[in-house]
């Protein structure tokens, strides 16, 4: 589960790509979508087929007709991943952590990307309020990983980790392959380092293959449409 304010989608994408580079079948759930809701649910980088969407949607609606939009999509994604028999599910949280739909599922690791001011009307007016809510995504005995945080936010994470008996691992100084990244911007190294930290732990726990050169290829292959994406000029239109 990927929780935070900035870089959740990028970190989720990096983790998915690194796992796929090592031969795993990966389900990736992100939000919001850019063009179509189908983008939110991907299996090995491919959107859920259009003909499967209504079939699975009907099953979710029949089982739980009163879900919110995000809860519905979360349930649909989990159902799609279960049917596909994926090896790893990467779930990006939608809003906060305490009551987010992705927190309802059991997880093997929780990642915290940089936490900042967002959704103040729902999560609270201060960074402490926001970080406290997001920190509640931690589960007892489940390791948590965090990117560098503002002091206020880190204090909240450390306090919740102690209360829940969770080991919180700070990733700023952990080993990281020196490779090109598929996502643009110097800030992406923070997200990639977090993804590598949780991948190293998961690979060790499951005895998955884990080679630095393969991880580097995975990081370089990352692509997230609409996020600092460069589109070349075509049909008389300028590049974007």
Label each PLM-derived region with a short phrase:
Residues 108-109, 121-200:
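Internal gly/pro-rich beta-alpha loop/helix module
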Residues 18-22, 80, 198-205:
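Active-site catalytic microenvironments for nucleophilic, acid-base chemistry
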Residues 88-93, 100-111, 115-116, 129, ...:
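Nucleotide phosphate-binding/pyrophosphate-handling subdomain across enzymes
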Residues 15, 77, 157:
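Aromatic/hydrophobic pocket-lining residues that form π-stacking "cages" and hydrophobic walls in ligand
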Residues 21-105, 123, 129, 151:
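ATP-dependent carboxylate-amine ligase catalytic core
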Residues 1-34, 39, 109-111:
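Walker A (P-loop) phosphate-binding motif
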